[in-house]
Amino acid sequence: MNPPGSLEALDPNVDEHLSTQILAPSVHSDNSQERIQARRLRIAARLEARRREALGEYLDGKKESEEDQSKSYKQKEESRLKLAKLLLCGTELVTNIQVAIDIREIHRRVEEEEIKRQRIEKLENEVKTSQDKFDEITSKWEEGKQKRIPQELWEMLNTQQLHCAGLLEDKNKLISELQQELKTKDDQYVKDLKKQSDDICLLLERMEEQVKNVMKTFREELYNIEKAFEVERQELLASNKKKWEQALQAHNAKELEYLNNRMKKVEDYEKQLNRQRIWDCEEYNMIKIKLEQDVQILEQQLQQRKAIYQLNQEKLEYNLQVLKKRDEESTVIKSQQKRKINRLHDILNNLRSKYAKQIKQFQEENQSLTSDYKRLVMQFKELQKAMRHFALIDDEKFWEIWLMNEEEAKDLIARAFDVDRIIHTHHLGLPWAAPDFWFLNNVGPISQQPQKSATQIVEEMLMRSEEEEAEEAAAEPESYLDLPKQISEKTTKRILMLLCDESGFLIESKLLSLLLPLEQNECYLLRLDAIFSALGIESEDDLYKLVNFFLKYRAHRLSSSLQIKPCSQASMEKASMEETSTRSELELAEQTEMEGEKEESLVEGEKEEEEETPPSPWVIHPNDVLKILEAFVMGLKKPRDSRAPLRVQKNVRDNSKDSEYWQALTTVIPSSKQNLWDALYTALEKYHLVLTQRAKLLLENSSLEQQNTELQALLQQYLNSKINSELQVPPTQVLRVPTK
């Protein structure tokens, strides 16, 4: 009944799959934490593959075609799936103990390695220090041999004795620490043995319980399958008998119907053949007449084309003469331009000389400014270094002063709590419970709250949207996230849903197949988590940057679309101004055609502007999502990849709650309890006065009792004396003897 597989023997397919991932941790890494993470990932992948195989799922996301299945088959499949799930859950329940033990052992080994490393470092440091002390003592002996004065020798011997005693004390201290560590290891070993025995007992109990559950479930499912087969057998017998009778009746009816239809079709086909012959003859005559008319029309068009050709030839000759005159005019203009070019060359040479002088002057100024810049940069770096140094010192001093004051305040609070406890339990006879304030558990300055991840923000948003779906009919303002520009949560949700729908290629096919049976919000949450991990979005700020980037892109596109219309009109007017005014008939015709097209395009553009409605500023086209993501990822990688210059990076601490914290420490004992203490103090003073008076009276009473006993003893001695019997009137007859 041992669970199949262990931590060391893993599936080779899972190992190869994990090794192909570039960013995944490796089991061959030098970092122990990375090796532990790699083993955990391989175990999780292997267990997931076994679970899918047991449940009948396929890794490629394909499902078998659903056919008409009988009740017995459905019952068998349900029983198989139920038993597979039961076995899988039982195996996981049993193997969870081994996994927990393995993880605990891994943590213990890591801690043991760290302790061993620290112990080795400590021993090495001790060896170095003891060797230095021994060398110092040895060198002092050489110096002592050179001294001749007894006083100096005596002082030197005392110092050497002190050094030797210190060296031996360090060694004894180290030996005691190692012995104490060995003792703790023995105790830990006994505890581990006890824990292992408890785990084995728990494992056996779970295995016995799973065996009983599996046997019981197998019997129930076997009974259900037998019952389903019996019901299906009765239904099949009844249905097959009924189908056979219906099939015989339908066959006889179809044979009669087929004979009647065949006779009708033969008659219809004969009539259709006669009608088709008549229609074909009429159509042939009509086509012949039409073709003769087309021949006559084509002959007339040929004569018209010949006349147009003659007219175009005369126009071309006229245009040739016009071009020759223009060529003569262009030669005159070329000569004028050459003279102008020569004059401009002279001006260019003068400007080049001035430009060279300016470049030389600017280079000298640049060198001087560069030297000043380097000097200022060095001063700035030194200033930054000093600022970092003083900032660290200030933080350390602030931390020490805070801890000192906090410790002193908490000591006073503890003394006050002890006094309050004694008053309640001893004097008032009331039960006392220690107050639980939030500031008593705080140690050190109050820090800021940790930033949420992008996945947590999306999860909170989806949960909030589910709660607000029932209240959408009410006219309430939209809730806002903590965004820089107060973007509504509804807009953020739309953008994330669009991103989830259009970025499915960033999600693995295995994950998509697993998301099919989940609910909509859970599916969206897992898809967005995978997309965020692929895009490198980790923190809350990255999510807000993504939403702002989408909205800025949409606003930029709207502004550019509004600028296209005036630009297009200006370009068309400029093109019309640049057209050359020619007197030829062809150019005039082309110009008129272009103006007509321009007017038509303007009219159509005005109609389209009137017909189109302005798009919503929050609507983003799905085709633009990939472009926006590409631009966002490129912009997100640049600040992360580029190394910013060294600067003073100091976390600004939020000190808004410091006064509240120290004020809360001073008000641990409320005013009502202080009034109770004052009243109790006055009552105790009165009680103390009464007790002192009572003590004085008790002392006086004890002294009087002692005197009374002494007097009684003297009186008894006097009465018992022999002289009383000799008297004529004894005092016993006169005096009344007191009885005890």
From Swiss-Prot:
GO cellular component: axonemal dynein complex; axoneme; cytosol; extracellular region; sperm flagellum
Organism superkingdom: Eukaryota
Basic and acidic residues bias locations: 575-586
GO biological process: axonemal dynein complex assembly; cilium-dependent cell motility; determination of left/right symmetry; heart development; mucociliary clearance; regulation of cilium movement; single fertilization; sperm flagellum assembly
Keywords associated with the record: Cell projection, Ciliopathy, Cilium, Coiled coil, Cytoplasm, Cytoskeleton, Disease variant, Flagellum, Primary ciliary dyskinesia
Signal peptide start and end residues: none
Subcellular location: Cytoplasm, Cytoskeleton, Cilium axoneme; Cytoplasm, Cytoskeleton, Flagellum axoneme
Residues annotated as transmembrane: none
Coiled-coil ranges per UniProt: 101-388, 691-724
Chief location: cytoplasm
Complex formation: Component of the nexin-dynein regulatory complex (N-DRC). Interacts with CCDC65/DRC2, DRC3, GAS8/DRC4 and TCTE1/DRC5.
Function statement: Component of the nexin-dynein regulatory complex (N-DRC) a key regulator of ciliary/flagellar motility which maintains the alignment and integrity of the distal axoneme and regulates microtubule sliding in motile axonemes. Plays a critical role in the assembly of N-DRC and also stabilizes the assembly of multiple inner dynein arms and radial spokes. Coassembles with CCDC65/DRC2 to form a central scaffold needed for assembly of the N-DRC and its attachment to the outer doublet microtubules.
Family: Belongs to the DRC1 family.
Disease named in the record: Ciliary dyskinesia, primary, 21: A disorder characterized by abnormalities of motile cilia. Respiratory infections leading to chronic inflammation and bronchiectasis are recurrent, due to defects in the respiratory cilia. Patients may exhibit randomization of left-right body asymmetry and situs inversus, due to dysfunction of monocilia at the embryonic node. Primary ciliary dyskinesia associated with situs inversus is referred to as Kartagener syndrome. Spermatogenic failure 80: An autosomal recessive, male infertility disorder characterized by reduced or absent progressive sperm motility due to multiple morphologic abnormalities of the flagella, including short, coiled, absent, and irregular-caliber flagella.
Identification of the protein by name: Dynein regulatory complex protein 1
Organism: Homo sapiens (Human)
